[in-house]
A protein has these predicted regions:
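Short, basic/aromatic recognition patches that contact phosphate-bearing ligands
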Residues: 1-78
Length: 78
């Protein structure tokens, strides 16, 4: 199955970040490399997006085995 995001690779900065949040809420986690591939951008771009989004959303990253980008389920924040 082709990821939905990859079908429309030319997204604005705002739209890419909005869809990145949606993808993370749907999956709960993913790797930077996989997200970069799906959004048709570099890993560096995804890392920059994550740094900005961490300021407003419960996103965190983990390096190493089992690492990636994670988002906390909003129901767990209460």
């Amino acid at each position: 199955m082709i990821p939905k995001v990859y079908l429309n690779p030319k997204l604005s900065l705002y739209e890419r970040r909005r869809q990145l949040i949606a993808v993370l809420y749907e999956r709960q986690s993913d790797t930077v490399g996989n997200l970069a591939f799906e959004f048709n951008v570099s890993s560096h771009t995804i890392r920059n997006d994550i740094r900005i989004l961490e300021l407003e959303y419960p996103i965190y990253t983990k390096i190493g085995a089992g690492g990636g980008v994670f988002i906390l389920d909003s129901s767990r924040l209460l």
